[in-house]
């Protein structure tokens, strides 16, 4: 099979578009098109060498790569779903907070994929100011040519959200400062859609100060309809993950090992990495089953 045929077959299979393949290979899409049609005027090796390198890399990845299950229906996910449902139905604001690596983000992503009018953004140190987080939300809502001015952004977001009966999820919201949280509160009240603040304990601890009516967070605290703490992964979570990977959850020795990993901070994330490495090892040994060893 010629190099040109291999590339053509990949595109025709629907796995990649020509533009996607060109990006992965690291060549210009127009140049790749010309080469495929035997009309490329430049040096053939300038296209063929990166193609060969990418095909070899892709083959190596195929031999060793093991993809983790995209979403596993764990008990913790249902705690998150219940809070998100409440935020949307009432509508109100909720918090889901606690340890990292316990499945909060994955559950929110699954909820967004399976429900209409759910938008999810992620705060970060670089995207935590009031103007930055409003801009992120505007982009997520599909507002084209979103302005950078805070007042215009806020008005456009309100206009877009009104009447949607939707839900806005803000992950890593522990990064958000007071003025950003206050603006979110005001928007939520005006448009009457649900808002969910997801993050670590800082999300709750800061807002909880509002239980004192003299505290700056008092107005925000009084609008929170539900606070859902997730302090650690449960054994039910770990059992569901083991079964999703095709492991025997009745194997006590195996489950003891998995529980010792999964119940620590960042447990489910670490557990997934361990299982992936174990699966790669098993794949290399042509073994269908991997155990605690």
What is the role of each PLM region?
Residues 1-53, 235-293:
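C-terminal alpha-helical "lid" subdomain
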Residues 71-88:
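Pre-Walker A adenine-sensing motif
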Residues 93-100, 187-216:
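Sensor-1/coupling segment of RecA-like P-loop NTPase cores
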Residues 88-110, 125-126:
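Walker A/P-loop nucleotide-binding motif
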Residues 124-139:
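Conserved phosphate-binding/catalytic loops and adjacent sensor/switch elements of nucleotide-binding enzymes
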Residues 117, 210-231:
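A short helix-turn-beta junction within AAA+ P-loop NTPase domains corresponding to the substrate/partner-engaging
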Residues 129-133, 144-183, 189-196, 233-241, ...:
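Mid-core helix/loop region of P-loop NTP-binding domains shared across ATPases and GTPases
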Residues 115-126:
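Conserved catalytic segments around the Walker B and adjacent sensor/switch elements
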